[in-house]
Design a protein with these regions (language model features):
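Short loop/helix-cap segments at secondary-structure boundaries that form the rim of catalytic
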Residues: 108-111, 124-130, 142-150
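Short glycine-rich anion-binding loops that position phosphate/pyrophosphate groups of nucleotides
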Residues: 43, 73, 106-108, 119-121
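Phosphate-binding/switch loop-helix module in NTP-utilizing enzymes
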Residues: 78-108
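C-terminal accessory "lid"/substrate-recognition subdomains
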Residues: 95-99, 149-188
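N-terminal phosphate/diphosphate-binding loop that engages ATP/GTP or pyrophosphate donors
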Residues: 25-81
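Walker A (P-loop) phosphate-binding motif
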Residues: 1-43
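Short, hydrophobic beta-strand segments that form beta-sheet elements in well-ordered domains
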Residues: 101-103, 113-118, 132-140
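Charged helix-capping and loop-helix junction motifs
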Residues: 51-53, 83-87, 120-121
């Protein structure tokens, strides 16, 4: 199995990360790229979980995990008593065999990332985070971001980032394919 391309979308709260990921996912799905998403609940505390069906009732009654599956679709609720590392969560998503895993949040992690710049105060992230590969800026911050950034900067209201992102995925997958082909040839 080829490991998925892992990429983060980072930025402060209320900067449009979820909307940005949704648009990126829609574009990738049009190209038959399978995407999984890992979202960090950065609002403090546990995420809200609706009490809708039996699986939720099992979970709220004390099950350490509750999984419901039907017709190939599943929903999993779980409590990691010691917390789960981002690596463990990525491994869980890898079970679905995605081509790409998009991570929303987890700013301090060392995966390649794009930063969303909506306010001038967001520019601090360009220097404060590791493995920043690109920035996407709102119109009012675009020129200032371009002057300050040492990475490619794209306007929010264009497809330029998506085109750049596809090149990153294709380059990554091509490099992996070359390495895999070399291993196969050596085994023969």
């Amino acid at each position: 199995m080829v490991k998925p391309f892992v990429f983060q979308v980072a930025g402060y709260q209320n900067r449009g990360k979820t909307t940005f990921i949704k648009k990126l996912m829609e574009n990738l799905r049009e190209l038959n790229v399978d995407v999984a998403v890992l979202k960090h609940h950065g609002h403090g505390g546990k995420p809200d979980i609706a009490k809708l069906k039996d699986s939720h009732n099992h979970f709220h009654a004390g099950a350490v995990a509750s999984l419901v599956e039907g017709d190939g679709t599943m929903e999993l609720l779980g409590n990691f008593s010691a917390g789960a590392s981002i690596t463990e969560l990525i491994h869980l998503l890898e079970l679905f065999h995605p081509d790409v895993i998009l991570i929303e949040g987890y700013k301090q992690e060392d995966f390649p990332k794009v930063i969303l710049i909506k306010e001038e105060s967001d520019l601090l992230l360009l220097e404060g985070l590791v493995n920043v590969k690109a920035a996407v800026a709102w119109p009012k911050c675009l020129e200032r971001t371009r002057k300050q950034a040492s990475v490619p900067v794209f306007p929010l209201d264009s497809n330029q980032f998506f085109d750049w992102f596809l090149e990153q995925i294709l380059g990554w997958h091509n490099a992996r394919s070359i390495a895999i082909n070399k291993i196969v040839e050596e085994d023969q």
